[in-house]
Amino acid sequence: MVNPLYQKHIISINDLSREDLELTLRVAASLKAKPQPELLKHKVIASCFFEASTRTRLSFETAMHRLGASVVGFADSNNTSLGKKGETLADTISVISQYVDAIVMRHPQEGASRLATEFSGGIPVLNAGDGANQHPTQTLLDLFTIQETQGRLNNINIAMVGDLKYGRTVHSLTQALAKFEGNRFYFIAPDALAMPDYILSMLKEKNIAYSLHNSIDEVVGELDILYMTRVQKERLDPSEYINIKSQFVLRAADLHSARPNLKVLHPLPRVDEITIDVDATPYAYYFQQAGNGIYARQALLALVLNRELVL
């Protein structure tokens, strides 16, 4: 049977059904347990990063190499015809699609990856982040990590902390977890960076429980997952930032009433919002979370590029 993700563009987490998510996570677990170094042996994948990236680019390219694919591309668009000679994004994608079997793309402009699908000639485009819009593979690795640490994706108590207004990771993760039963959300953010109304409306429509809070202390004893994010200094007045920054910092002492199964996650990079002493606690899992990006991205590449995937 042809797998449902074969030759599919992956631009938004909403492009994936619950069944698609579960399939991808099963494949990720299989690839983590049993590497397949020749699965994409005869494939060529373009890694096109039009803006800076550390974790996403390196984990995607590691995923490609570990599956046996050949990798071409760039990490600085200023050294391409688009950056040097004024070539349009449409023309750049039209040309790249002549050379490769799939395109992994990050771009600072919202909607750029969706636009790329119109000019890729049917070559699948995988969104590695487009501005503040979508970052579906981050959501996949977050889901994989939650399932790995909790053994399930339903009946999860999850708190999201920090910049919930502009942080694309928390929007996508909330939308993805809303596909599973019994999850409860705790949103901890200043009013200026609160979760957008469209996310709250979606949860209300689905009759999914959520609550708004002012501090981590209020809920830490109820949580399975504590998902920290960086408060973005550039979004706030300096005086407001100083106040908010100190309010939303996680220290090891804050975890004294945590459940034994709690895991602290963060999409990284962190700045000051998780102190170093948390790293040594059994709750810290953000570096392992970053490592899981390899397996989540391997799974997506394997599914998109294999008509009938047998592992």
Curated annotation (Swiss-Prot):
Coiled-coil intervals: none
Record-listed E.C. numbers: 2.1.3.2
Top enzyme category: transferase
InterPro entries xrefs: Asp/Orn_carbamoyltranf_P-bd, Asp/Orn_carbamoylTrfase, Asp/Orn_carbamoylTrfase_sf, Asp_carbamoyltransf, Asp_carbamoyltransf_Asp/Orn-bd
PROSITE patterns the UniProt entry points to: CARBAMOYLTRANSFERASE
Pathway: Pyrimidine metabolism; UMP biosynthesis via de novo pathway; (S)-dihydroorotate from bicarbonate: step 2/3
Entry GO MF terms: amino acid binding; aspartate carbamoyltransferase activity
Key words of the record: Pyrimidine biosynthesis, Transferase
GO cellular component annotations of the record: cytosol
Pfam family, one: OTCace
Gene3D superfamilies reported in the protein's UniProt record: Aspartate/ornithine carbamoyltransferase (3.40.50.1370)
GO biological process entries: 'de novo' pyrimidine nucleobase biosynthetic process; 'de novo' UMP biosynthetic process; amino acid metabolic process
Binding site for L-aspartate: K85, R168, R230
Binding-site positions, carbamoyl phosphate: R55, T56, R106, H135, Q138, L268, P269
UniProt similarity note: Belongs to the aspartate/ornithine carbamoyltransferase superfamily. ATCase family.
Function per UniProt: Catalyzes the condensation of carbamoyl phosphate and aspartate to form carbamoyl aspartate and inorganic phosphate, the committed step in the de novo pyrimidine nucleotide biosynthesis pathway.
Protein name: Aspartate carbamoyltransferase catalytic subunit
